Amino acid sequence: TGRSDVCALPYGINTVSLFAYVFLVMLPAKMAAESTGAADPARVAWEAGLVACLGSGLIEFLGSFVAERVRRATPRAALLSTLSGIAIGFISLGFLLRTFARPIVGLTTLGIIMLTYFGKVRFKGGLPGGLVAVALGTLLAWITGIAPAAASPHGAGIFLPVPVIGDLLHALMSGYGLTYMAVIVPMGLFNVVGSLQNIESAEAAGDAYKTMPSLAVNGLGTMAAALFGSCFPTTIYIGHPGWKALGARAGYSVLNGFFMTAVCLTGTLAYIAWAVPIDAGMAIVLWIGIVIAAQAFEATPRHHAPAVVLGLLPALAAWGAMMAKNGLRAAGMGMPGGPPFTEALIQAFGKSDTWIHGAFALEQGFIFTSMILAAATVAVIERRFVTASLWCWAAAALSVMGLIHSYRWMPTDTVMSLRPAWPWAAGYAVMGLTFLAARWITTEAGAGPAEDTSSGA
């Protein structure tokens, strides 16, 4: 392109899928193996994870051929608002709590990041703010006793990757793909949509990448990971605007690859994690979350701001549901020897006017819900009511398929059930009919974009 300011797409482990595959695939597989007296339940869990990773990569690869059409049909506010909600809830809020739990390290490093990245100043000598924050944070963590958090590691050496094709074939023949299809398919689809949103985020920051090859390589990388023993899919990562604002360009991704390869294959990653605690760098991650959230407003038309706000709410609700369940586990519920999660929780939370049923419903497929609500809102703002109704009916269809809002109770969690979520499907259908009838049941209350009754987006 001749440009010197292009930032490469971030790439790494998909955190959402990691937790889904650990707790909804690998743990059940291990427990089932233990109940049948298998000789090596841990190996059974690993093989089930391999199949899940391979399946996710295949879905991502196939999805790359249709993803650009979805992207063109979806307003930018809908794509970016979902990332905004994830950035605020699952990135910024978690690290904000940690910052104020350990204020000496947290607030000091946050001040440095605010000074250099929000204030647009540099330290004398050309020292980058991120390096200063991590170095000072590490020093303060050791002085205050936060570090080290564990005993000194040992076992450095050379550990080259080994293909596990035979194990993967054995896992496929064992039928794990069919057993855990209800988890693999939704996670694969979520990865496709999430990657789409991150590509849109990169374009909003000034770096346009083609959708098909980006997602295709993403899927191929995930399948390659499974061939070498990884249970966790890779993804186009959230955070491109933050990395670009840090000064990262095309080379940072290559350097990341070389560095992570070196420390992982030599076993030295454990030493780095021991010496440099998470607290030392959490201000940078907090800042990246803020930048991602801000971009959703800065890179979209001003009058679409309500759509962005509505689109980020399901992700915040999902984060709230996770926090509520973590609190219940901390109190002993869902833990060994404690009471299981049951439907009685809905009534118990209701006594404090907490509608936890809604939070659990929003948690399932919140990436789809966020995108659809924001897209429908954009259409309503622009008075394209037929388009808004189509988005609502898409949500109704996803509800019938169980990809959003449908959940079931497990002793330790609430998880996606893939059963029809009829109440929500009906609600979305009626919502769509309301928008469809808008031209006959409403009158203009003020100036705005002309109504478009076409079915285009």
List the predicted regions and their residue ranges:
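Hydrophobic core segments of alpha-helical transmembrane domains in multi-pass membrane transport
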Residues: 20-28, 53-64, 83-93, 106-120, ...
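Helix-loop-helix hairpins and the membrane-proximal interhelical loops
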Residues: 126-212, 416-424, 433, 440-456
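Early transmembrane hairpin of solute transport permeases
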Residues: 1-110, 242-254, 258-285, 292-300, ...
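Inter-helical loop and helix-membrane interface segments of multi-pass membrane transporters/permeases
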Residues: 25-47, 68-69, 76-77, 85-122, ...
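Membrane-embedded helical hairpins/re-entrant loop segments and their flanking transmembrane helices
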Residues: 1-5, 176-250
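C-terminal ends of transmembrane helices
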Residues: 1-5, 58-72, 112-123, 196-204, ...
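C-terminal transmembrane helix-loop-helix hairpin of multi-pass membrane proteins
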Residues: 118-124, 167-179, 303-457
